[in-house]
Regions:
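Active-site-adjacent loops and short helices of periplasmic peptidoglycan-processing enzymes
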Residues: 17, 21-165, 172-179
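Conserved active-site loop region of the serine DD-peptidase/beta-lactamase
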Residues: 177-187
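Bacterial N-terminal signal peptides that target proteins for export
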Residues: 1-10
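Bacterial N-terminal signal peptides
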Residues: 9-19
């Protein structure tokens, strides 16, 4: 089972490396999810803009709500005008239409759909503001000391920050607490 989780964490590290320009590579951390051993790192605690890695916290909170029964995978949630107005990438559903939590999670994590981050936030907590408050409370509870969220999709806001270390911890927590949802990360 430990080898099963190594691939997503290694992929997260590779994506971070590939997304950064060669001359100005961003902070990074690569660790073994089974043991927690850090294999290599560069400025892992340095604050930086998380972009779409924000969606990992969005997914984590949704996974917690699925576990407690607050949400169900087959539950339909409405697309609000606010969710529909999010910048691309998005799937572009019309306000008032409905989507299952399962499909919203798939499009959030596979296509990085910004509109689905808002749909899930509103479906889970009623408002994006309340969801973001929960994101920050959860980050604090997990010890993500360099992390502060302003929105659930990662669209740019200079106040939205994290670190490679914090994202690594969050990824490991997701894999440890919710192995049943690992398929969302391998599509």
């Amino acid at each position: 089972m430990a080898g099963h989780f190594r691939k997503p964490v290694l992929m997260l590290g590779l994506l971070s490396i590939l997304a950064s320009p060669v001359a100005h590579a961003g902070p990074s951390v690569l660790f073994d999810a089974a043991t927690g051993e850090v294999i290599t790192h560069d400025r892992a605690g340095e604050p930086w803009y998380p972009a779409s890695l924000t969606k990992l916290m969005t997914a984590y909170i949704v996974f917690k709500k699925l576990k407690t029964g607050t949400l169900r995978l087959d539950q339909k949630i409405l697309v609000s005008p606010l969710a529909a107005s999010q910048e691309p990438s998005k799937i572009g559903m019309r306000p008032g239409s409905a989507i299952s939590v399962d499909l919203a999670l798939q499009t959030l994590l596979v296509y990085s759909a910004n509109d689905m981050a808002y749909v899930l936030a509103e479906g889970a907590n009623g408002t994006v503001f309340s969801f973001v408050q929960e994101m920050n409370a959860t980050a604090k509870k997990l010890g993500l000391s360099a992390t502060h969220f302003v929105n659930p999709n990662g669209l740019f806001d200079p106040r939205q920050l994290t670190s490679a270390r914090d994202i690594g911890v969050l990824a490991a927590v997701i894999l440890a607490e919710f192995p049943e949802y690992s398929g969302y990360f391998s599509q």
